[in-house]
């Protein structure tokens, strides 16, 4: 067992990366003290865990968009149209899209689209099946990246034929690249 550290280590030392091997007693950090057993001594010693790798693993860039609501937040029937857009401040990679309609469409599926600078990101558009509230998860991306400065727009391209569906929330799961 090694000697105790010669200096006191503070939380700010850990955050700003000023803790070095001289500050740690031998064997002070072990897998027994780490709850996630996927982190092993071999991975740490072999350089498999780095600050860059850890930072890249947490660059989630998720966002949501609401359609089919009035100015007071009450549900209104969806119509076929563009509902709005946003300007991306950074490069992203799309991972998934989720859709949920407060009122399910009936008679026909509700179909929505997300476009980059006017071009769809899908080869198979996301759908909420007639009688369902959540999307069927059968969409297929044709494009998975977008760049800083791109205009991301949200569209409804088909509504239910008996009941249009209303209160559509679309969540985009993405990562900063």
Walk through the language-model features, giving the residues of each.
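Hydrophobic beta-strand residues in large extracellular and virion-surface proteins
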Residues: 9, 14, 44, 49, ...
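Surface-exposed loop/turn positions
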Residues: 18, 92, 147-150
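Secondary-structure boundary/capping motif
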Residues: 22-25, 32, 43, 49, ...
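Beta-sheet-rich sandwich/jelly-roll-like modules and their strand-loop junctions
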Residues: 56-111, 161-177
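Terminal beta-strand-rich extracellular "head" domains
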Residues: 100-148
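Short beta-strand-plus-loop segments that form exposed binding edges in beta-rich domains
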Residues: 154-162
């Amino acid at each position: 067992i090694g000697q105790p550290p010669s200096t006191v280590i503070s939380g700010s030392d850990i955050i700003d990366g000023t803790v070095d091997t001289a500050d740690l007693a031998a064997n002070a950090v072990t897998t027994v003290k780490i709850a996630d057993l996927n982190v092993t001594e071999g991975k740490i010693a072999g350089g498999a865990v780095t600050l860059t790798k850890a930072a890249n693993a947490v660059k989630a860039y998720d966002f949501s968009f609401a359609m089919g609501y009035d100015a007071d937040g009450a549900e209104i029937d969806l119509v076929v149209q563009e509902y709005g857009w946003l300007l991306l401040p950074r490069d992203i990679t799309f991972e998934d899209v989720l859709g949920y309609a407060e009122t399910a469409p009936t008679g026909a599926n509700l179909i929505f689209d997300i476009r980059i600078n006017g071009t769809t990101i899908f080869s198979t558009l996301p759908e909420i099946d007639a009688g369902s509230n959540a999307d069927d998860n059968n969409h297929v991306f044709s494009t998975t990246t977008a760049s800083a400065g791109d205009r991301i727009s949200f569209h409804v391209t088909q509504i239910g034929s008996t009941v249009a569906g209303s209160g559509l929330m679309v969540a985009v799961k993405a990562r900063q690249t």
